[in-house]
Amino acid sequence: MSNPTSTPRADGFRMPAEWEPHEQTWMVWPERPDNWRNGGKPAQAAFAAVAKAIARFEPVTVCASAGQYENARARLDDGNIRVVEISSDDAWVRDTGPTFVIDDKGDVRGVDWGFNAWGGFEGGLYFPWQRDDQVARKILEIERRARYRTDDFVLEGGSIHVDGEGTLITTEECLLNHNRNPHLSQAEIERTLRDYLAVESIIWLPNGLYNDETDGHVDNFCCYVRPGEVLLAWTDDQDDPNYLRCQAALRVLEESRDAKGRKLVVHKMPIPGPLYATQEECDGVDIVEGSQPRDPSIRLAGSYVNFLIVNGGIIAPSFDDPKDAEARAILQRVFPEHEVVMVPGREILLGGGNIHCITQQQPAPRKA
């Protein structure tokens, strides 16, 4: 495995859209008791359900610690799911795993961004995070893929979405937050994104979803469904703290053009809830110094936008909410050639994210 000192763009690589063919999807097995209630057992059942749903469409590799390997292997009893032993600090592989890039000659490489647990010592969610910062490298070594490392640039995969044709969507709330890359200007951040993902146009939404503890990851708020079309979390309730965020994002999207000069078509996705953790759910989480405590009075950042596109399928969260059926119908309408599979997402949400956050697609090699 090589470690190029150049950039993906200079070497002819780009980040593909999520709907381009996958070789597999990666996940990490949850166990951290100060984030996942009841020793992680309810979350493990939820992750297993997601893995098995994905495995209907493509191979899945789940990374588990030495202490959880045997348990994970037993619970993931599907021939299309591989379990490998990798140590980590938590289970958010979208943010800790590599961002894969491809060229037109059949090669796949990975970008290994710096990781600081969503803010380091200024708002980060736990410490230490060293093992999480090593996850991308370990995955790339297992796959024997070349690795581009950005030691001086922090980024989480959930903070970006691309259309595969030169346009990236992100949020100012996250990427311009002083707890990520305070030494860089917006222009310098854009230059890094262009160099490592081979994008031309960057659309900056002001904020992500209200109370998203990642500082507003775009993958919980707005995503591409095809070139020129996006899906935006939405509420018409003017008393909802998300209302102004949705309105501001819509204005930016309607005024933007992508790298191909297209105006964007915006599809609206209702926001579930409002959703809250119960006192019992919060009491099941260990209280540990350096970790974020759970509070039943704080609204959860639930979103149907936090889904994964797989080969021929859409794996999306449900919340036992009246809007679940509408969300499924919208996803089926915007993805008419995919099968929409809804998987219970509450346990994942209680930990701070959802299906897109706990998965990382590895694109299939392609030749022009």
From Swiss-Prot:
What GO molecular functions are on record for this protein? agmatine deiminase activity; protein-arginine deiminase activity
Pfam families in UniProt = PAD_porph
The record's InterPro entries line, in alphabetical order, gives:
Agmatine_deiminase, Peptidyl-Arg-deiminase_porph
Specify the superkingdom.
Answer: Bacteria
Q: Which PANTHER family does this UniProt record tie to the protein?
A: AGMATINE DEIMINASE-RELATED
Q: Which family does it belong to?
A: Belongs to the agmatine deiminase family.
Its recorded name reads Agmatine deiminase
Query: From which source organism is this entry?
Result: Pseudomonas aeruginosa (strain LESB58)
